[in-house]
Amino acid sequence: MAVWDLFGWFRDILSSLGLWNKHGKLLFLGLDNAGKTTLLHMLKNDRLATLQPTWHPTSEELAIGSIKFTTFDLGGHIQARRLWKDYFPEVNGIVFLVDAADSERFNEARVELDALFQIPELKTVPFVILGNKIDAPSAVSETELRAALGLLNTTGDARIEGQRPVELFMCSVVMKSGYLEAFQWLSQYI
């Protein structure tokens, strides 16, 4: 029995230092055509694929560093958004993608994001917002996207007791840039 206690103590120490394998449940959310499925395929297979809109939720197992994630890619069209709530129980993080090149839909994205922030079930769940498609000529700057989404005061690397961790990262899934930093940031809260 004492050996198991010692093992548990050692595991707890390693876990507190972030050195033990962790497992998390992530939801990939955002409006349709933001790049959720493309990102998931890039993380899983390290390549782009020609994809159709996501009509049905899909699940994948991913490993990023020492953390294993069960990811759920939920469609972003209006009908699919009604199903998002079914996946909230036991979620450890939300990855919310926004098409940074589609400024006409920023308000719609902000409404959905604000609605998610108001859900009591998610009050302590960390959110990483990815401003995707920064390689597109019409993409806005990080400052413009933060203003459009009402994310001028995010938590960054600070851990503030009682405050949900939220951070915005700009990325281009097709250019393979920006999103790994976002997952590294998110992993510290899982």
Curated annotation (Swiss-Prot):
Subcellular location: Cytoplasmic vesicle, COPII-coated vesicle membrane; Endoplasmic reticulum membrane; Golgi apparatus membrane
GO BP: endoplasmic reticulum membrane organization; endoplasmic reticulum to Golgi vesicle-mediated transport; intracellular protein transport; membrane organization; mitochondrial fission; mitochondrial membrane organization; nuclear envelope organization; positive regulation of ER to Golgi vesicle-mediated transport
SUPFAM superfamilies: P-loop containing nucleoside triphosphate hydrolases
Protein residues bound to GTP: 30-37, 73-76, 132-135
GO cellular component: COPII vesicle coat; endoplasmic reticulum exit site; endoplasmic reticulum membrane; Golgi membrane; mitochondria-associated endoplasmic reticulum membrane contact site; mitochondrion
Gene3D superfamilies linked to this entry: P-loop containing nucleotide triphosphate hydrolases
One term of GO molecular function: GTPase activity
Keywords: Cytoplasmic vesicle, Endoplasmic reticulum, ER-Golgi transport, Golgi apparatus, GTP-binding, Hydrolase, Membrane, Nucleotide-binding, Protein transport, Transport
Catalytic activity: GTP + H2O = GDP + phosphate + H(+)
Topology of this chain in the membrane: Peripheral membrane protein
Biological role: Small GTPase component of the coat protein complex II (COPII) which promotes the formation of transport vesicles from the endoplasmic reticulum (ER). The coat has two main functions, the physical deformation of the endoplasmic reticulum membrane into vesicles and the selection of cargo molecules. SAR1 controls the coat assembly in a stepwise manner. Activated SAR1-GTP binds to membranes first and recruits the SEC23/24 complex. These SEC23/24-SAR1 prebudding intermediates are then collected by the SEC13/31 complex as subunits polymerize to form coated transport vesicles.
Subunit structure as annotated in this protein's UniProt entry: COPII is composed of at least 5 proteins: the SEC23/24 complex, the SEC13/31 complex and SAR1.
Family: Belongs to the small GTPase superfamily. SAR1 family.
UniProt protein name: Small COPII coat GTPase SAR1
Originating species: Eremothecium gossypii (strain ATCC 10895 / CBS 109.51 / FGSC 9923 / NRRL Y-1056)
Upper lineage: Eukaryota, Fungi, Dikarya, Ascomycota, Saccharomycotina
Gene: SAR1
